[in-house]
Amino acid sequence: MRQSSQVRETKETKIKLNLQLDESTNVSIQTGVGFFDHMLTLFARHGRFGLQVEAEGDVFVDAHHTVEDVGIVLGNCLKEALQNKEGINRYGSAYVPMDESLGFVAIDISGRSYCVFQGELTNPKLGDFDTELTEEFFRAVAHAANITLHARVLYGSNTHHKIEALFKAFGRALREAVEKNANITGVNSTKGML
């Protein structure tokens, strides 16, 4: 089974994260940031991933370090779980509607870290979650996993719905990208490596 477990401890956070790419029954998220827990649960559910996250952070300051560091560890686990990347689709994309909002995510498991984020999040805070941290999370994942990730809110009016559409689209796009494909021999690149 393609999986990874990692711990990252700094003076600001302690993150324990387990990711299973081929098993979706075990999802448990506890970051201390309720809205972020909800988004990670949606990501795992719609991507059909097993995901367990325990995070302790300096949320008395704000949620920035916790959200960013969870993104870093998730990216590291994704990179490790993919092993040599042989036989995977490599590319994945998904549009997801959430009521009046529409989100889009495209992924290339390229070995090159790059993130493009486009979306106007008009409500600056949802619970304890600063909505600008949505972009920080996606940037952290893309950088740590060495993937190219485009996340875009096409339209919408409700900030919660916009972010929810992105996390669901992220799960669905990543599922497509990591899926094994019997028609692909080796890695899906003319270079012979990713």
From Swiss-Prot:
Recorded GO CC terms: cytoplasm
NCBIfam families per UniProt: PRK00951.1-2, PRK00951.2-1, PRK00951.2-4
UniProt source species: Bacillus cereus (strain B4264)
EC number of this enzyme: 4.2.1.19
Catalytic activity: D-erythro-1-(imidazol-4-yl)glycerol 3-phosphate = 3-(imidazol-4-yl)-2-oxopropyl phosphate + H2O
Single GO molecular function: imidazoleglycerol-phosphate dehydratase activity
Record keyword Amino-acid biosynthesis present: yes
Main location: cytoplasm
Subcellular localization, as worded in the UniProt entry: Cytoplasm
InterPro entries: IGPD_sf (IPR038494), ImidazoleglycerolP_deHydtase (IPR000807), ImidazoleglycerP_deHydtase_CS (IPR020565), Ribosomal_Su5_D2-typ_SF (IPR020568)
Keywords, sorted A to Z: Amino-acid biosynthesis, Cytoplasm, Histidine biosynthesis, Lyase
Name of the protein in question: Imidazoleglycerol-phosphate dehydratase
Entries under HAMAP family matching the protein: HisB (MF_00076)
PANTHER family in the cross-refs: IMIDAZOLEGLYCEROL-PHOSPHATE DEHYDRATASE (PTHR23133:SF2), IMIDAZOLEGLYCEROL-PHOSPHATE DEHYDRATASE HIS7 (PTHR23133)
Pathway, per record: Amino-acid biosynthesis; L-histidine biosynthesis; L-histidine from 5-phospho-alpha-D-ribose 1-diphosphate: step 6/9
Gene3D superfamilies hit by this protein: Imidazole glycerol phosphate dehydratase, domain 1
GO biological process annotation, one example: L-histidine biosynthetic process
Record-annotated membrane-spanning stretches: none
Lineage top rank: taxon: Bacteria
Family (UniProt): Belongs to the imidazoleglycerol-phosphate dehydratase family.
